[in-house]
UniProtKB/Swiss-Prot annotation:
Activity is not affected by the metal chelating agent EDTA. Addition of 1 mM Mg(2+) results in 15% increase in activity, while the enzyme is strongly inhibited by 1 mM Fe(3+), Fe(2+), Cu(2+), Zn(2+) and Ag(+). This is Phenylalanine dehydrogenase. Pfam families: ELFV_dehydrog (PF00208), ELFV_dehydrog_N (PF02812). Shows high catalytic efficiency and thermostability, and is a promising biocatalyst for the industrial production of bulky aromatic primary amines. GO terms for molecular function: nucleotide binding; oxidoreductase activity, acting on the CH-NH2 group of donors, NAD or NADP as acceptor. It is an enzyme of class 1 (oxidoreductase). NAD(+) binds at residues 54, 125, 156, 160, 190-196, 213-214, 253-254, 274-276.
Length: 382
């Protein structure tokens, strides 16, 4: 009996140790629909937590917990970098997105989200689609990134790609002293929703591209697109993209692509792309700096989609989204300059900026002004 009690206490201690940086972790279980989900709220200093919901057949609950804790913390930094009044959150549904989905499952998930009373807003991520969240919307108002037909801003890959292009302009300026996108060659990994749009825009500017993707149709399409532009496209094997000679490596597919194995192969001057968590560890950021490779922090350069979904809660306004997305240029350039000034990596400079912004904004958000409600309460009316 004593042994059982001791084990339980130790398990509780381990769980709280894992979530020591987080405000709240919610385990959601609905046996009728098969829903097993975890919602993690990292920090709400800037406002309610915001983050997508992914569905994945995790091997264990612990694996799912590790993922949602890591991703939600990353969202706190991403929201701070994008200067939106939201904190970091994330949700994961444990299950196979090909076989385990149902309208009832997402309605059940929506009910759990609604039970948080506006502390958490969510939308699509890996393994989930907007069709899934149309069902969740029947149970909660805290869904963002909805289709235009349902009052949302539409395809978030458009501002995401635009933000990457602004980041590439800033990177070109830092490398060559001018923003001209045609001035550089680019090795693009991934021609998905975002990567393809980035490649199209670069071709229109007349840039030289080296591309790879597992989808042969996407490769054929971008080659056909190149024929009507002054740019050029060369298709390379998936693993060869790391050793491809180019000015800028543009990862637009997987996370963790900058690691011990790939970092020695790189033959580029800079890395700037839309993929999340490009550095396997922060140490790899330091290794890039030692090699003289400029790195655009992923959560700054790919923030265009976040800017759009956060802006929905003011009411859809595409011009406002475009104006905010354009600021990614200044944010990337400032990060480069600050890192150089302080003798630190660009990722360390970005993290410092975000942490300072959260601390400074925290004082304003906790200063009571009488009749003026907190911003995030007002937004519940949209």
């Amino acid at each position: 009996m004593n042994v059982t009690k001791k084990t339980s206490v130790m398990e509780d201690f381990t769980l709280f140790e894992k979530m020591s940086e987080h405000e709240q972790v919610v385990f959601c279980n609905d046996p009728d629909t098969g829903l097993r989900a975890i919602i993690a709220i990292h920090d709400t200093t800037l406002g309610p937590a915001l983050g997508g919901c992914r569905m994945y057949p995790y091997g264990s609950v612990e694996e799912a917990l590790e993922d949602v804790l890591r991703l939600s913390k990353g969202m706190s930094y991403k929201c701070a970098a994008a200067d939106v009044d939201f904190g970091g959150g994330k949700a994961v549904i444990i299950g196979d997105p090909q076989t385990d989905k149902s309208p009832e499952l997402f309605r059940a998930f929506g009910q759990f989200v609604e039970s948080l009373g506006g502390r958490f807003y969510t939308g699509t991520d890996m393994g989930t689609t907007m069709d899934d969240f149309i069902h969740a919307m029947k149970e909660t108002n805290s869904i963002v990134g909805v289709p235009e037909a349902y009052g949302g801003g539409g395809d978030s890959s458009v501002p995401t790609a635009m933000g990457v292009l602004y980041g590439l302009k800033a990177t070109n300026y830092m490398l060559f002293g001018k923003e001209d996108l045609a001035n550089a060659s680019y090795a693009i990994q991934g021609l998905g929703k975002v990567g393809y749009k980035v490649a199209e825009a670069l071709l229109e500017e007349g840039a030289q591209l080296f591309v790879t993707d597992i989808n042969q149709q996407s490769l054929q399409d971008i080659q056909e697109k190149a024929k009507s532009t002054s740019g050029s496209v060369t298709v390379v094997e998936s693993t060869a993209i790391y050793s491809q000679e180019a000015d800028i490596f543009v990862p637009c597919a997987f996370g963790g692509v900058i690691n011990d194995e790939t970092i020695e192969q790189l033959k580029v001057k800079a890395i700037a792309g839309s993929a999340n968590n490009q550095l396997l560890t922060e140490e790899h950021g330091r290794q890039l700096a030692k090699k003289g490779i400029l790195y655009a922090p992923d959560y700054i350069i790919n923030a265009g989609g976040l800017i759009q979904v956060a802006d929905e809660l003011y009411g859809v306004n595409k011009e406002r989204v475009l104006a905010k997305t354009a600021r990614i240029y200044d944010a990337i350039l400032e990060t480069y300059k600050q890192a150089d000034l302080d003798g630190i990596t660009t990722m360390e400079a970005a993290n410092r900026m975000c942490e300072q912004r959260i601390r400074a904004r925290g004082k304003r958000n906790h200063f009571y002004t009488g009749s003026v409600q907190p911003k995030w309460n007002i937004r519940r009316s949209f």
